[in-house]
Every structure is written in C-alpha cells, then in structure tokens.
Amino acid sequence: MLKPKFIIAVCITTVLITFTLLKSLYAAEEYSLTDLYKIALERSERIKLSEEDLYITENTKDKALAVLFPRLSAFGNYTQYSEDKRLPTGAIIQPDHSTSWGLSLNQSLSISGREFDAFKISKEDIKKSQYDLYAVREEYLFGVSSAYYDVLKMKKAVDIAKANVERLTKHKDAAAIRVKVGEITKTVLLRAEAELSGAQSELIRAENNLSLTKAVLARIVGLTGDYELKETPEDDEYLPDYKMEDTSNPLKEVAMSERAELKSLDIQKKIAGDQVKYTRGLYWPTISIEGIYFNKDEEPATAFLIKESTYAGLKLIFPFFEGGLRRAEVMEAKAKQRQVNLIYEDMKKKINIDIEQAYLDYKTQKGVLKSLRDRLTFAKDNYSAVSRQFEFGLANSIDIMDANTLLVTAERQFVDAVYNQRLSILRLERVTGRLLKSVTAKETAINSQDE
C-alpha cells in the first residue's frame, strides 16, 4: 500500500506540471521588431491590395499583346424553309433546308502602330506598379516601426508611473509616521496623499494608453490575441550610424536615386508621353485583313449551290469627321502629360523637405539624448539626497515633491528621446528610400547566421 506522503508528493508534482504546461500554452507571444516586419509583409491588407494592382497590370499587358495577334473564329448556320421552290423547268431555286459553316481569320491594325504603343505602355505600367508596391511596403514598414516604438514608450511610461506610485507611497507612509510623532503637520500628509492619488490616476492613464497602442500595432501588423514586445540586438541592426554633417545634401542625392515614388513618377512621365503618341494614332486610318473559308450544303441542292469557297478581303477605314472627338482626346492626353510633369516636380520638392525635416529631427534627438541622460542621473541623485534630508527633517514636503516631479519628468523625457532617436534613424532610411532594402538585407544576414 502506498504511503500518504508519497501520494501527496505525486499529486503536488502533477499539479505543478499541469500549471506549467498551461502557463506556457496560454502565455502571450513575444515579438521583436524583426518578427513584426516579417508578419506585416505577409499579412498586410494594404500590401496585398498593391500586389493585386500589380497582378492587374500584368494581365493588362497580356490583353495588349492579344490585340497584336489575328483572331480566328468559327461560325455555323442551319436554315429550315417552309418548302422547296422550283422553276417551271424543274430547277430548284429554294431548298427544303440548308446548312453552312466556316472559319474566319481577321486582323485590324492602325497604320500608326498605336497597338504597339499600347503594348509598350502596358509593359511600362508593370514597372510602375512594381515601384508602387515597393513604396507601399516601405511606408508600411515605417508605420510598423512607429507603432512598435509607441508601444515601447508606453511600456516605459507604465513602469515610470508604477515607480512613481511606489515612491509616493513610501513618502506618504513616512509622512504618516512623522505626523503621529508630531514632527510635521497633517497638511504635509494630505499633500502626500493628494500627490499619490494623482500618481495613481497617471498610472491608470498610462496603462490604458499602453492597451491602445498595442491594439493599434496589432491592427497594423495583423496580430491576434495578447502579445508582448521584446527588444533584441537584431533590432539595432536596422539602425545605421549616420555621421553628423553640416548639410543634408548627400542624403537628398541618395533619395533622388532611391525613392520608389520618384521612380514610379518617372515611368509615369514616359507613359504620359507614349499616351499622347497613342492618342494621335486616331488620326491615322485602320487597315483590316480578313480571310474566310465557307462551306454550304442544301437539301435538295439548288442549281447555283457553291459548296466550298475561300476568299480574302482588305479594308481601309479612314474617319474624316467625328465632331472634334480625336482632337479633344489628344488635348486631354497632353494635359495629363503636363499634370504628371508637375506632380513629378512637386514630389522632388516634397522629398527634399522630408529629408531636411528628418535630418534635423535626427540631429535634434541625437543632440538632446546625452543631455537628458545626464539630467536623469542628476534627478535620481537629487531625489535620493532630498529623501534622506526629509527623513532627518532637513527638507520639507515641497522639496521632496519638487524632486519627485523632476525625476518623473526626466525619466519620461529620456525614454521618449531614446526611442525617438531610433525612430528618427528609421525615418531617414524611409525618406531616402533605403528602409525596405536595409530590412531585407539585414534579415538575410540574420537568417544566414542562424543557419
């Protein structure tokens, strides 16, 4: 018979194992920035929409190519007459019924070759859609990065708020003890309780903001269920070290050659020029070539029945007057060409401003980071010193509240500066058009190291 102690030990072990398994099963998934990039590229509806646009343009090229090939069609006919009819001589002029079938091969082309222009436009449109897809992916990755760092900032904000509540709780308890022994007045305790209540409300607000930012990130990436974020060394692989320069001109030159939006508009300019040429082709005549094989059978056969015939035809169509339609279409195509040129120049100016703004933001964040780190160190030392002075009656409640406020402000500003500095680097990568290339290159390097 088993001893009761052994049975109890087995039961406790079973419960612990079960609890551990359930905890690991329902534990929140952890994602790094690398993981979020991969998931976003796979699940994003916006990226999939852009991929469908690319698929549509590829099919448009197939349709433009199909126009260049002749069309082969078959036809057939069966006719039942009320009766056959004959001449007085007995010759049949209307059969009882007849059947016919045949094959038709025809091709229509404009002398201007506008069908070839349409095929050329369709090929250029594919390249444009590829650049558009690249730009969508890159912009989406930056959106993921921004949401990722928003969550990390709010996590730190929650930690700061919790630490603030703990400090103020200790201060309130210390104030309560000193009130009991008569060292300080009750107003000091009331002030401490008021500050603690405010800190607790800030903690609730920070926790709610954290939940909101996590929901936004989950929506952008396509995550389901609860999750946590982790900062890994691989995340820093996406942060190149920019040298502080006097101007942002080198970055602008890179953007002019790398930005997918600019490449897309450059192709759009070519398409607009080809579209004008395509529309002008309406002034040229269209030539149609047709070849037909025809077979007919009648019962009873008429005297003029030709059972088989093969013939070809050539037709030239030249529209002389269409109410000014062709001229209006050419003018419209030219106007669209001018629009594309204006959009292209406007995009260049916008990119230059984006570079300037991102570069100055990067310089600002990098410049203030060291100062805020020093300020945080001083604020911590100051709070520790004032706390000790308060314990010995050398500082009052206002002094410790001021020291605590300075510490909380320094912590928040330092955390914001750390993550804003990282995001400013990614923003520079985005506005120069190198973010997606950098991400894919780093992911390839990381995967090769894992293998």
Predicted segment positions?
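Periplasmic alpha-helical coiled-coil/stalk elements that build and connect Gram-negative outer-membrane
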Residues: F6, Y31, E139-V254, A358-D361, ...
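Bacterial N-terminal signal peptides
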Residues: A9-K23
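Acidic, low-complexity, intrinsically disordered peripheral segments
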Residues: Y26, G225, Q413-E451
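Bacterial Sec-pathway N-terminal export signals of envelope proteins
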Residues: Y26-N77, E83, S108, G225, ...
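Small/polar (Gly/Ser/Thr/Ala-rich) solvent-exposed segments
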Residues: K48, R71-P95, N106-A135, K263, ...
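Amphipathic alpha-helical coiled-coil segments
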Residues: L49-A64, V136-I160, K170, I177, ...
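Hydrophobic, lipid-facing positions within transmembrane beta-strands of outer-membrane proteins
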Residues: T99-L105, L251, T310-L316
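Short, charged, amphipathic alpha-helical segments
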Residues: K123, K186-E195, S397-T405
